[in-house]
């Protein structure tokens, strides 16, 4: 399918993105399932792939997932790479058969990313604003908690704050924290 690109063959991904642009795509987002499990640091190979893909005129944004923890957000020439969005639709809670006491607390962290994409008078399309909302997975209920948006009463506030601090400490300065007011 045209929305699915090949597994980390950088030149093939770039070729597929170029094909998408020739076919009418105005903004290409590359989704990569990658990263060392439970590592908040991006690897040298991830950084190399990010640099190669974002140097292409056909790749506009990278969103990574797979490490089960938050990984940094990089901004290169007004293009973004979210190396890892953490856990949102999955978690490592364990169960009666497979306890997960070895899973780091950071596997409960995730984020919702937001990118404002604008078209300029010259026809150029790019990200003009970007932000995130940190999330936390309650291992007892499997509930996704958007931090600062909707926090249940049955959750320890200290757990939420630790998650929020871990997330902001990893992603860096290139993505601003979105704040919602009631």
Question: What residue ranges belong to the model's regions?
Answer:
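Acidic, metal/ion-coordinating pockets
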Residues: 1-182
């Amino acid at each position: 399918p045209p929305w699915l690109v090949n597994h980390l063959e950088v030149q093939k991904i770039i070729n597929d993105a170029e094909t998408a642009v020739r076919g009418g795509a105005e903004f290409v987002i590359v989704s990569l399932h990658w990263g060392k499990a439970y590592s908040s640091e991006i690897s040298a190979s991830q950084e190399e792939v990010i640099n190669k893909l974002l140097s292409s005129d056909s790749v506009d944004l990278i969103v990574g997932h797979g490490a089960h923890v938050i990984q940094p957000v990089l901004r290169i020439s007004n293009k973004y790479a979210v190396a890892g969005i953490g856990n949102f639709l999955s978690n490592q809670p364990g169960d009666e058969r497979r306890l997960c006491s070895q899973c780091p607390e950071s596997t409960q962290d995730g984020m919702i990313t937001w990118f404002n994409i604008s078209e300029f008078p010259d026809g150029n399309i790019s990200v003009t604003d970007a932000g995130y909302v940190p999330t936390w997975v309650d291992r007892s209920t499997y509930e996704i908690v958007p931090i600062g948006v909707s926090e249940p009463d049955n959750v320890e506030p200290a757990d939420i704050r630790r998650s929020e601090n871990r997330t902001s400490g990893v992603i860096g300065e290139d993505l601003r924290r979105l704040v919602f007011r009631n």
